[in-house]
């Protein structure tokens, strides 16, 4: 046996996960959340797609990601059977709450009793409390990007693809690139955000644009406006099939204005907060 494997679901690949992944040669994870099979009614909205998770895990220095499909068949296997996925490694790193096998009976002590070298990595903390994917989802739901990003160790991001706009932003003097979000984000509040696209600062509205009346979006859309001296960002987006949008800061909640002039004044104020 050789090499170190880090085991866990790693949704978000937050600072706590990074402690587990540190120094690992491989990561053992699932493509889908166990709740999607065992308790679909309670399945959490994931912080990232599997492709994003794999990319971030590898950016931590992990060479190989072993991704299993979580199925009812796998869930019904005894923990002794699950050991087959770990037997080629000399050491296993995991969090204190990592479990595997039927009835979640497999854990670090189960492996140690069978001769495995297991290191249980202590939780990372933020503001005196354990960092978890659940806690990050809760922060995003409140629009608390400062806390969410601090726990992630990077800006939370989504993937989007361009959709046709209605020209209203341009008519107001604030042209936008309009994106449909490809991965289902947590319940991020509708509102105005400071974002980064290709490393360029921008301002974005996530929501329905209710002031537009009949021109409002039927489903939530991300409308992104760049400062006037960054036309290259528009070109970069136009050339991309998928665009990564990093959320840096929550500015305000979305609301319906009495008229376009009132909306235009508010957009000007929002832009000053982001760009000045």
Label every model-predicted segment.
Residues 1-55:
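N-terminal catalytic cores of NTP/NDP-binding nucleotidyl/phosphoryl-transfer enzymes
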Residues 14, 57, 92, 148, ...:
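Residue-level signal for inorganic ion chemistry
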Residues 36-119:
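N-terminal Rossmann-like or analogous alpha/beta NTP/dinucleotide-binding catalytic cores
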């Amino acid at each position: 046996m050789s090499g170190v494997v880090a085991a866990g679901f790693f949704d978000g690949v937050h600072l706590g996960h990074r402690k587990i992944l540190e120094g690992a040669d491989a990561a053992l994870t699932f493509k889908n959340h166990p709740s999607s099979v065992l308790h679909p009614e309670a399945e959490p909205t994931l912080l990232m797609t599997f492709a994003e998770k794999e990319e971030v895990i590898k950016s931590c220095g992990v060479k190989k990601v072993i991704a299993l499909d979580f199925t009812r068949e796998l869930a019904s296997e005894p923990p002794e059977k699950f050991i087959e996925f770990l037997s080629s490694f000399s050491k296993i790193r995991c969090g204190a709450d990592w479990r595997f096998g039927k009835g979640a009976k497999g854990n670090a002590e189960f492996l140690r009793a069978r001769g495995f070298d297991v290191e249980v990595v202590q939780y990372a903390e933020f503001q005196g409390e354990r960092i978890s994917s659940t806690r990050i989802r809760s922060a995003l739901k409140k629009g608390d990007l400062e806390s969410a990003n601090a726990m992630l160790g990077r800006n939370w991001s989504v993937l989007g693809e361009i959709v046709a706009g209605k020209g209203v932003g341009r008519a107001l003097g604030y042209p936008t690139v309009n994106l449909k979000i490809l991965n289902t984000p947590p319940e991020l509040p509708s509102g105005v955000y400071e974002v980064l696209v290709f490393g360029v600062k921008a301002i974005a509205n996530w929501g329905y644009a209710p002031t537009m009346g009949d021109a409002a979006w039927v489903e939530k859309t991300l409308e992104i406006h760049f400062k006037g001296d960054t036309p290259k960002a528009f070109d970069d987006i136009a050339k991309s099939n998928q665009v990564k949008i990093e959320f840096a800061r929550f500015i305000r909640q979305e609301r319906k204005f009495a008229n376009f002039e009132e909306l235009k004044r508010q957009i000007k104020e929002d832009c000053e907060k982001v760009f000045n």
